[in-house]
Amino acid sequence: MAGITKPQPQKGNESAAGEAVAASAYNGLTQQPGNACAPGSGQNAHANAADADDARGKPSTFANSAGAGCEHDADDARFMRRAIELAWRGAGWTNPNPLVGCVIVREGRVIGEGWHERYGQAHAERNALADCARRSGQGASGQPASPDDPAHGCAQGATAYVTLEPCCHTGKQPPCTEALIAAGIARVVVGSRDPNPLVAGKGCEALRAAGIRVDADVLRAACDELNSVFFHFITHKTPYVVAKWAMSADGKIACASGDARWITGPEARADVHELRHRLAAICVGIGTVLADDPLLTCRRDTPGSQPVRVVLDSRLRIPEDCALVRSCSEGAAALVVATCAPVADEASPEAAKAKRLASRGVEVLSVAPDAAG
């Protein structure tokens, strides 16, 4: 953060330094023992060894979701890597959905590609099938193909490489399994299993029941890394929290005098804004607000999504003229202030302040105090 100052003990878990970010679909952080937020690692040894084989072009054997062994070769690994690259393009835009990429191949040639681009919009498989139609000239340029015949037959007999098991239920979008079956796909290569109880193997089962060959766990470690937070939330029903702070090489987070100054460089600050783009919410204590007057918005070189901004403020001390409140009035990202102050007591000054904040677009969330206040 800009202007990080020496933290002072606060009640109600309020800190003047650092920020915590709760994610529903952040990508690229995986958990390791003793290091809760280590980038790009923490996968199981079997999967890592398999990926190493892929890098050398050797076939690797995995157990598929039916319990039988399946093999994949260097081509399978190559096309799955491309699907992973595509999936990353949705980072920050698909919350709370997972990141998914899909590549459709016939006779060693890519005939369609797609990824889940935005929450509520078409999934990766349907986008890839629509791309098949566009490339073949059977679909209107820039327009999605028919959900009933997503590739207009041009993907008949092809192989689909998908980073996550295709969905088989109806939500904001129809099942991807139906689209793959209708398109005449002959083989589906899956990276990650979907732990969502609505899928959880049922997608692969539906494809097999339709006569489609399904090979699972291809580059599973890399595919799992795409959705470490989605998997955590689905499995544990709790937010995946990333702690971020600025620290000097000798382990200090502020000057001895306590005055605020930059201790991070432009690369680190750019990384922070990339985090904010990819995460669903950002949380700070009132100490940070009082010391730094931050905006907590995503300010990348290219447009990014904006996380919900959360302030832990046990006594409702947030200044009404601070940057957070002003930006909320100007239509910036949502702002939630969690407080233990007696905002329900109409006669209290805190209740009047809460009403003024609400009139400016701030959501004041009343929570019961814990033992520490």
Question: How would you name each of these model-derived features?
Answer:
Residues G142, P147-P150, H232, V242-A249, ...:
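Active-site ligand-binding patch in enzyme domains
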Residues D75-N95, F233:
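Short, basic/aromatic recognition patches
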Residues V100-R106, W245-A246:
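Short beta-strand scaffold segments in enzyme catalytic cores
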Residues N227-T238:
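Flexible, polar/acidic helix-loop-strand segments at domain edges
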